Amino acid sequence: MAESVHSLFDRTAETYDRARRRLIPCFDELYRAAIEALPFEREDEIEVLDLGAGTGLLSAFVAFSYPRARITMVDAAEHMLEQARERFALGGDRFRFEIADYGEGRIAGRYDAILSALSLNHLPDEKKRMIFGQSFSALNPGGVFVNADRVLAETPELERRLHDSWLRRARELGVGESDLRQALERMELDAAATVGDQIEWLRVAGFREVGLRYRNLIFAVYSGMK
């Protein structure tokens, strides 16, 4: 049986964060764009859900930008989420952790923001649409959904060119061949979709002010408001 996405991420949990900045040449801009999509004041007490939280990288950006935010991190890769627990060990009950496959269940609770980074691309399109609908239902009025993710280009030729550019840039930044090989192995299990399709699915789910916030090579940030 082919190895699952969750087990692949568990197997690379220890080195995942270290390689991230080289595997994502636009790392800072990508995560900054996700945070800038949040329409809140710094001192607001917001409830945030991080889907596919992994080691807690995106949640760390949220926690720094919103020091009174309460953040729930969900991931099916237990070892990855253990890294997140260690990252936020001094945070008390401000941070919650749930080992679960969010693509197989329902989103429980009410939130002001539901975010994800480099996770939804692992789900087939019908499950992406399901998550968009569940997210809309789980958000408070005025809440926001934000996804920073790997996306598919609009044509096969453009996809090939962007993928080649990403590979070249990652190598220029010094990514280790082992880390790159593991990333390519994970990407073989991806089900990335175009930005246009995902924006349309958000609209169908009921979101307003839907749009692209950032795009660079094979990465993008898009969002929608309830």
Show the residue positions of the predicted features.
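A short glycine-rich, Lys/Arg-flanked "PGG" loop and its adjoining helix->strand segment in the class I
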Residues: 129-141
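Core SAM-dependent methyltransferase catalytic element
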Residues: 208-226
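Class I SAM-dependent methyltransferase SAM/SAH-binding core
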Residues: 49-51, 55-104
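Class I SAM-dependent methyltransferase Rossmann-like catalytic core
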Residues: 10-28
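C-terminal alpha-helical "lid/dimerization" subdomain adjacent to the S-adenosyl-L-methionine
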Residues: 148-204
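A short acidic, Gly/Pro-enriched loop at the edge of an enzyme's catalytic core
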Residues: 106-114
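N-terminal, positively charged/glycine-rich alpha-helical extensions of SAM-dependent methyltransferases
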Residues: 1-15, 166
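Conserved alpha-helix/loop element of class I SAM-dependent methyltransferases that forms part
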Residues: 26-44
